[in-house]
């Protein structure tokens, strides 16, 4: 994360760190070049795709909480790193419109290629914990609403018996030493009729198999919570040549006794 700019020295350090980050993204991972190659399905293109997507990526990395903070002129001008936006400032509606039209598969491929570079450059040659590359896997809720929904939304009844629509995914990322890298994400899928929506374990197995197929031996150990103490999931890890560490709560200590016996 870039240093806070409370002093002139802090401002200078922040600018240097941002410049170094952008240079590294361009020279090593070729991310700006790949962004320029994304498909642009807009009929009208008053602002180039790159001039929207690249700033969005940078602001996500800088952990800005709201696009309104960035893409609202003129009051946010001082909050916007000048290195990231050149030319006409896109309005937040233009940002939303473009992002909604980008093919997620193209973004996923850029991410996968970034992981390939990390492996090729042996970023994790010393491991992340005790000499091993350890990765955690868990479910993450991404979006929730009782009013808005899409065909890919999962659904359930909340405490007031209203239907809640949400997106949920399973994420696998390194734990331990920096850098903390997300290897991949698998969206859980809705099911028709009376069947329950796809569960976290199903998505996790699919994610592990996909990562193994795409990246080979991407980690040594997978760490998970008690939900993943499941024979089909553990067998999937074994098939992919992965060890596992699963954390159980104290009230489930009988499972330890069963395992020891």
Question: PLM features: residue spans?
Answer:
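Short, contiguous clusters of charged residues that form electrostatic/catalytic patches at enzyme active sites
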Residues: 53, 167-170, 202-209
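Basic, short loop/linker segments at the boundary and entry of helix-turn-helix/winged-helix-like folds
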Residues: 22-54
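Active-site-proximal, Lys/Arg-enriched surface segment
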Residues: 96-178
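Charged, often Cys/His-bearing segments associated with DNA-binding zinc-finger transcription factors
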Residues: 1-26, 32
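Short, positively charged, Gly/Tyr-enriched micro-motifs
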Residues: 45-115, 230, 237
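A general structural motif
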Residues: 129-132, 167, 180, 214-219, ...
């Amino acid at each position: 994360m870039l240093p806070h700019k409370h002093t002139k020295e802090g401002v200078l350090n922040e600018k240097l760190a941002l410049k170094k980050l952008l240079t590294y993204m361009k020279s090593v991972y070729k991310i700006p070049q790949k962004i320029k190659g994304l498909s642009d399905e807009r009929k009208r293109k008053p602002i180039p795709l790159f001039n929207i997507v690249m700033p969005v990526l940078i602001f996500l990395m800088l952990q800005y909480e709201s696009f309104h903070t960035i893409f609202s002129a003129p009051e946010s001008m001082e909050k916007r790193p000048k290195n990231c936006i050149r030319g006409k400032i896109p309005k937040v509606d233009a940002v939303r419109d473009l992002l909604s039209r980008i093919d997620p598969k193209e973004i996923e491929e850029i991410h996968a290629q970034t992981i390939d570079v990390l492996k090729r450059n042996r970023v994790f040659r010393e491991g992340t914990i005790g000499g091993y590359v350890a990765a955690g896997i868990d479910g993450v809720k991404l979006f929730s609403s009782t009013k808005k929904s899409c065909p890919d939304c999962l659904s359930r009844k909340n405490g007031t018996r209203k239907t809640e629509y949400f997106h949920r995914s399973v994420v696998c990322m390194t734990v331990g030493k920096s850098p903390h890298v997300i290897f991949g994400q698998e969206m859980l899928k809705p099911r028709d009729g009376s069947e329950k929506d796809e569960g976290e374990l199903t998505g996790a197995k699919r994610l592990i198999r996909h990562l193994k197929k795409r990246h080979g031996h991407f980690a040594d150990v997978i760490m998970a919570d008690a939900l993943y103490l499941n024979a089909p999931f553990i067998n999937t890890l074994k098939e992919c040549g992965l060890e596992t560490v699963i954390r159980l709560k104290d009230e489930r200590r009988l499972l330890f006794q069963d395992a020891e016996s």
